[in-house]
Amino acid sequence: MAEEDKSAEPRTTATKQPAVKKTTAKSAAAKTASATSQTPSKRTAAAKKSTASTARKRTTKAKAAAPQTVGEAPAPVIERTSPEQFGRVNVLDITPNVENGLFPARVELGEAFNVTAQVFIEGRTKAGATVSVRNARGREVERFAMTCTNPGLDRWEAMVKIGEHSDLKPWDADYAAVKRQLGEWQIVVEGWEDTYQSWLHDAAIKVKVNDDVENALESGAQLLARWADAKDSKLSAADKKVLRDAAKTMENKSLSAEERLAAVQSSDIEQLHETNPLRDGLSESNPQRFRVERPKSSFASWYQFFPRSEGAYYGEDGKIVPGNLKTSIAGLERAAAEGFNIVYLPPIFPIGVTNRKGRNNSLVAGPNDPGSPFGIGSELGGHDTVDPQLGTMDDFKAFCERAHELGLEIALDFALQCSPDHPWVKAHPNWFRTKPDGTIAFAENPPKKYQDIYPIDFNADMEGIEKEVERIMDLWVKAGVTIFRVDNPHTKPVRFWQDVIAAVTKKHPEVLFLAEAFTRPGMMRALSYVGFTQSHCYFPWRNTKEELEEYLEETNGNGGFYQHNTFWPTTPDILTAYVRDNGIAGHAVRAVLAAMGSPSWGIYNGYELIENKQRPGFEEQIDNEKYEVKVRDWDSTEKYGIAELLTSLNKIRDTHPACP
């Protein structure tokens, strides 16, 4: 026996069902007791009254629920009361998402990105899909129509953007309008029954074979009339007129069936179906979280230099006269001339004296050795103070102002560690770990030892440390810093960074964070989840064709929605054998790969001068600038050609259509 086709029967609306009052056991018992306590005559009278009342109600209900035709009756919306429930239309497998929506995927303001989902409905009924962009409060801001790109897999896609792109910089006067668009957003994929397309498909066949034509055309006219009245479709008065005029033509029996059908196949109605469709049985997915960051937050070209080496020279006595923030203006101008847009400084805080390191990380410092800027803190101050050897806070603010005039951002290295002389050691001794002999433990990464650095112990007062770091970062942001490059964040609790970054970006949503974390993939991913916009990575050690192909695919794949790898050919701590052994050609090759292989790349100054001598036994530069002041001859860059190449690479990047 053939299965009965219920879909061929007239539908009745299910959108406004009468509310059903729940009956508890207690109320049922009370009603029963009340009924049994009545006398027989009273019960009989009550029964007659109840029967009459029921009959009247049933009669009224039957009149209200008169059968509706296919064109008149919308598919009902089925409310979802828990995340795992399906609606009337099924929505699955939304991308992009991060850990099934637990963490936000990251996109730039106004950046176009692809949203995909599986959207389907039972039987041969046609489905439609829309992407709804909503603000943090859940209010819809914009809709994007989705296209079915793989009917066999019910796969739908749409190019979506959140907010409007802007070329304004964080220091520009009108930047407040950009800041308001940054932060948490939601994307919801809405599936719906495409009643129009389902009807049109069948009606075209029926008109062609002359089968039940009048019913088909009448249903279409009713459908158009209902579409014109649908508030969800957000139609203009002109749009409604188009639909209603087509409905009248459909009802005009003086025309041929083909002419009547043609009225609903016009380009105007096809366009309305694309932009303002009739969406029956609307079903929303669970909201997908997105974090919108400022333009070029992941498209960046970094340039690193040490202020104490900028403008340094040999005095008449043969000793080096170090540079400072004022002489470092020359470094800003060089970075801008080469086309970079971020200047990254190492820590510029006072350097400790106790256990100060000498040249090449030697244990004993000479009388003229400046120490490592990563040995932070002295009696002159800590992380909230400018090293007097470099200048004052006013000098730093002037430095930032000049950078901004040149279109450059300032990124400041934030190394959360202390020298033995840091004010925190006395003010907060519980922030440090002590050995059994009572001394504070210095930093170690066996076999490496850092006697000039005390690591922070987060187990005693993490909340207090968080508040202090938030205060310090706020101070530097107000001075002109827009990016923090965090040193070794993977050696601190992820939750610590989650709290700090959330607090800082709540107040300053334009601020970005880069993780200098050479660590395991899980830790790198977790740091990205909690707000590190960019990350150092293992690009310097990817040299073969196979290694590069694999790494480029990884860097530019879906992982880019949470982790943005920044490619650096060298750093003060990284000088690979490839760069060491291949001279100018090697420097050129690695620069091209870095600039073209990732949206974000960086150069450590001196690259233009082919500084490629390794410290014996280490993959780092000899005479490391972390431990001494370097005097460089910048007039000699022309003979190498690397500075010109860097300039060309940045120009190619900035003028490429993919540049945001």
Annotated model-derived regions:
Residues 327-350, 481:
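Catalytic domains of carbohydrate-active enzymes, especially glycoside hydrolases
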Residues 301-303, 343-345, 410-412, 484, ...:
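Hydrophobic faces of well-ordered beta-strands that scaffold small-molecule active sites
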Residues 2-9, 66-123, 198-231:
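Non-catalytic, glycine-rich low-complexity segments
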Residues 296-323, 351-399, 426-463, 622-632:
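Aromatic- and acidic-residue-enriched carbohydrate-binding clefts of CAZyme catalytic domains
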Residues 353, 560-570, 576-660:
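Loop/helix patches that line or flank the sugar-binding groove of alpha-linked glycan CAZymes
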Residues 147-217, 224-286:
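Extended acidic/polar, glycine-enriched regions
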Residues 1-75:
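Intrinsically disordered, polybasic Lys/Arg-rich low-complexity tracts
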Residues 487-565, 613-648:
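Active-site-proximal helices and loops of the catalytic beta/alpha 8
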